[in-house]
Regions:
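Helix-turn-helix DNA-binding module
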Residues: 119-136
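Short amphipathic alpha helix immediately N-terminal
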Residues: 104-121
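N-terminal interaction/assembly modules
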Residues: 1-102, 153-169
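DNA major-groove recognition helices of helix-turn-helix
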Residues: 137-151
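Generic alpha-helical hydrophobic packing signal
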Residues: 14, 28, 106, 124-127
Length: 169
């Protein structure tokens, strides 16, 4: 059996495509929420006159310090979210563009990969969706995965057999 780590990685990316896409959307939403919270203008509380004496209830951290720490925490979250996005978003963009290119080259192969790996459909359902037999669907899935892997990681990811020529002397 032929084994290639790049093909296994592409298969895993396809299987988790919806999960990764939703994660990217959620992280972008979290970044927007943190930025909106940073844009809010913080105003310190006004001193109040209380009939009871004291210095404010023994609170050790002032409200201004709490707001400053909250801003620092929000900025730290934004940096973490952006680092997470920098890891996964280029990969998903590359997968999207490679799938679009595969669809332009061979729509049947793109349908097979989408149905079988992204939608997690059975081979029978995939064959109906791609309008081909189950056996043909399985064979084409292997070649389509190799093609998609080559598109994503370059020609070195899927080694091709070159011609072997023997010369007589």
């Amino acid at each position: 059996m032929y084994h290639n780590d790049y093909i296994d990685a592409v298969t895993e990316y396809l299987r988790r495509y919806r999960e990764f896409s939703q994660y990217i959307a959620n992280v972008k939403t979290d970044i927007d929420e943190c930025q909106r919270m940073l844009e809010l203008e913080a105003s310190p509380a006004a001193s109040s006159m209380s009939p009871t004496g004291g210095c404010g209830g023994g609170e050790k951290v002032s409200q201004e310090e709490r707001m400053y720490m909250q801003r620092e925490d929000l900025q730290r979250k934004i940096r973490k979210y952006r680092a997470d996005l920098q890891q996964i978003e280029p990969l998903i963009r590359r997968l999207d563009s490679s799938m679009a290119s595969l669809k332009d080259i061979n729509e049947t192969d793109a349908r097979i990969l989408e149905s079988r790996y992204i939608d997690d459909a059975s081979w029978e359902s995939t064959a109906r969706y791609a309008c081909c037999s189950v056996g043909s669907c399985r064979r084409r899935a292997r070649t389509a995965l190799k093609t998609l892997t080559g598109m994503m990681f370059g020609p070195d990811a899927v080694p091709m057999q070159t011609s072997v020529v023997f010369f007589k002397r």
